[in-house]
Design a protein with these regions (language model features):
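Short, aromatic/His-centered strand-loop micro-motif at the edge of beta-sheets
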Residues: 112-135
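Short, conserved, GDST-rich strand-edge loop motifs in beta-rich repeat architectures
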Residues: 177-180, 357-361, 407-424, 468-479, ...
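Extracytoplasmic low-complexity segments
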Residues: 22-52, 198-243
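Flexible glycan-contacting loops in extracellular carbohydrate-active proteins
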Residues: 156-187
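Beta-propeller blade signature
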Residues: 367-378, 420-436, 478-491, 536-554
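Conserved blade-ending motifs and adjacent loop-strand segments that build the rim/top face
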Residues: 389, 442-455, 488-518, 554-556
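Localized edge beta-strand/strand-to-loop motifs within extracellular or lumenal beta-rich domains
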Residues: 132-146
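Glycan-recognition/cleft segments
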Residues: 83-112
């Protein structure tokens, strides 16, 4: 927590080893996020996806047969039945693959217009899983076919009289008698057509950076076109924020926390706890007894060791714990604090310590660093950093290494007084928690566009980068971008690496934060804004990590 339409995409294949820290959790992983995503039953038939090789014209293969390879990723939706592909010979004989993820099943159907179809299927929940790439290979021989699905072989006969006129269609089909609007919820990539000896005739990587003109994508060997209708590209998820959900909160100043292990976002009002799970896409609500500490910025976090929520207040040494069994807080009364608004916080799970920095209240910007030791001290200790770093709020905080934090930007004044020339800060500091010292790493030149930060930053030490949500703080109707800054550099700049999210900035009454979820290697932006009748609106957005650099941006709502 204390953490480009593209004209051209630079990256053909993302094989990035990442080393970043979020909530004190260090992760290293590889990402291969590309492919063509098919729109299915969630849209009307006119907007479902097709991939038609050679624009629907027949392809000729050797008389002895050919091999088709591709990777597929099935996704869970309300309706999971649909065609993966149809292979059609002489507009008469066919071999189809049909998926039904609900039963972990893929069916293979072979038939023609003048005889009864033959059908076999693979139903295996250990092999056919949602949201996982798996290889499929189909070997066509003169009278039979061998289908290998994620390593499992299936055999059946077919009635193709030859391979001189073969049409191949993925997803929706409008080809005569082979019309179908049922599309499997899927993504595909690495599509190749080969000889039985392994010589590749055609290859479509399907990463959007391949040779593409209008709705056609061309294979990398012979420039054979494939027509894409209503397609979406997996790689777009690295620069377009996807709206995950939104819901109303029955309180004007809700509290926010995230459990990165289970993927739960917790939002608390003064009476209820809202829990949204990003894996299952479910929202649960429960009423509780007592209340968390309340204020205009979040003062709640998820304790990963105790696996529950805690609420904190710098004026109370006793922490406020949530008991999920009794649905109650350990503090029965409602306590509201107006100081220390929009402070940064970081929980060091390795040492079981909570750190707070900065904030605003009573016309004063804070330069204090607070520490709470949950192991033995059980009280707040304070260190003033005013002489080392100008007091501020609306900054971003992220863990750099053990006992070292990065403080990025913000708004405040050199003296801490609101009336004493308040200004935006475009700087980066390294804060040593052991020594209480602060080192200024750089300061950007003043920009014409004022901007501040979301509460948390994601630090990627391998690429020498720090990521934060940024937005203008000199207007009400503004927009949030994900921005990248180099940590060690002599020429610091802000690089926008996403499109935008509309944001209504009402100073301390609006709040946005950035989280990393290791299970789906994605960033999540959570926005809390005032709504009608003293309530709030929570919006959650998702971006695949690492982000890509766009040449154009567009607003989304």
């Amino acid at each position: 927590m204390i953490f480009h339409r593209l004209h051209q995409i630079i990256i053909l294949l993302i094989y990035l080893s990442l080393s970043a820290t979020s909530y004190g959790y260090t992760f290293e992983h590889k990402i291969e996020n590309y492919g063509l995503t098919f729109a299915t039953h969630t849209v009307d038939q006119d907007h479902r996806t097709s991939l038609i090789l050679n624009s629907g014209k027949g392809i000729s293969f050797p008389a002895e047969g050919f091999i088709m390879n591709f990777d597929i990723k099935l996704r869970q939706e309300l309706y999971t039945y649909g065609y993966i592909l149809r292979v059609i010979s002489h507009n008469d004989q066919n071999l189809d693959l049909v998926s039904y993820l609900y039963d972990s099943k893929i069916s293979i159907i072979s038939g023609s217009s003048h005889e009864k179809s033959q059908m076999v299927y693979l139903a295996d929940s250990m092999l056919i899983k949602k949201d996982q790439w798996m290889p499929i290979q189909i070997q066509f021989f003169p009278n039979s076919a061998k289908i290998k699905i994620n390593g499992k072989n299936i055999y059946l006969s077919h009635s193709f009289r030859d391979f001189n006129d073969v049409q191949i269609i993925f997803g929706a089909s409008n080809l005569g008698r082979f019309f179908s609007g049922d599309v499997a919820p899927m993504s595909i990539r690495n599509l190749s057509l080969q000889s039985l000896q392994g010589k590749t005739f055609y290859y479509w990587k399907l990463d959007r950076s391949s040779k593409t003109t209008n709705n056609f994508v061309y294979d990398s060997i012979s420039d054979l076109p494939a027509y894409v209708k209503n397609g979406k590209w997996e790689i777009d998820k690295h620069y377009h924020w996807q709206r995950v959900t939104s819901f109303e909160i029955d309180y004007k100043n809700p509290q926010l926390a995230f459990d990165e292990i289970k993927g739960n976002f917790f939002v608390a009002s003064d009476k209820k706890l809202y829990t949204y799970n990003v894996n299952n896409k479910t929202l649960d609500t429960l009423s509780f007894k007592g209340a968390p500490f309340l204020g205009v910025s979040s003062q709640m976090l998820f304790h990963p060791l105790k696996k529950t929520l805690l609420s904190y207040n710098i004026y109370h040494n006793k922490l406020n714990w949530f008991n999920p069994t009794t649905s109650s807080w350990s503090v029965n009364q409602k306590i509201t604090v107006d100081d220390n608004q929009h402070h940064n916080r970081f929980f060091d799970k390795d040492h079981d310590k909570l750190y707070l920095y900065g904030g605003y209240g009573r016309h004063q910007y804070s330069g204090a660093l607070y520490e709470y030791n949950l192991k033995d001290n059980f009280k707040w200790s304070q260190m003033n950093l005013d002489t080392l770093i100008s007091p501020r709020y609306l900054s971003a905080l992220g863990k750099y290494s053990d006992n070292k934090l990065l403080v990025l930007g913000g708004y405040g004044s050199h003296s801490g007084k609101q009336e004493d020339f308040p200004q935006n800060f475009y700087d980066l500091y390294l804060l040593n928690l052991n020594t209480g010292t602060c080192k200024k790493l750089w300061e950007m030149n003043h920009t014409d566009e004022h901007f501040v930060m979301g509460n948390s930053a994601i630090v990627d030490t391998l690429t020498n980068s720090i990521y934060a949500l940024t937005y203008r703080n000199d207007c009400y109707n503004t927009a949030i971008y994900l921005s990248q800054f180099l940590i060690k550099t002599n020429r610091p700049i802000r690089q926008i690496v996403s499109d935008s999210i509309l944001y209504k900035f009402r100073d301390i009454y609006s709040y946005c934060d950035l989280f990393y979820h290791p299970n789906d290697t994605s960033l999540y932006a959570v926005i809390l804004e005032p709504s009608k009748n003293e309530s709030s609106l929570c919006r959650i957005y998702k971006l695949a990590f690492p982000p890509l650099i766009p040449t154009k941006t567009s607003n989304i709502t």
